[in-house]
Regions:
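Long, charged low-complexity interaction segments
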Residues: 1-37, 76-77, 84-91
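Amphipathic alpha-helical scaffolding segments comprising HEAT/armadillo-like alpha-solenoid repeats
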Residues: 41-43
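Short, cationic/aromatic linear interface patches
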Residues: 45-91
Length: 91
């Protein structure tokens, strides 16, 4: 699977019926730029936030992004391994 841009990923989620409030979309881009995270890591943080919280939680999302960037995590696979190892989520 090729990496989608954040915009493409959000459109994909919307096509599956998930609706983001307008402020959430802005916050997603804020977090991406604030942490200088790649699209792949940003999308993974969105995915894991939704799985853990069952809705978009901006502070949880930014916290994940910060952890991923601080630990030099660059792929979805590595991000999922990281949250499993740190027991941040039960996935």
């Amino acid at each position: 699977m090729s990496v989608k841009t954040v915009e493409e990923y959000l459109l994909h989620l919307q096509s599956k019926g998930f609706q983001f409030p307008e402020d959430a979309v802005g916050f997603i881009y804020f977090g991406k730029h604030y942490t200088n995270a790649s699209d792949e890591i940003t999308n993974t943080a969105i995915e894991l936030t939704l799985k853990a919280q069952l809705h978009f939680d901006g502070s949880f999302y930014v916290s994940l992004l910060e952890r991923f960037v601080a630990n030099k995590i660059e792929t979805r696979y590595d991000a999922i391994q990281y949250v499993k190892e740190k027991q941040l989520l039960l996935i």
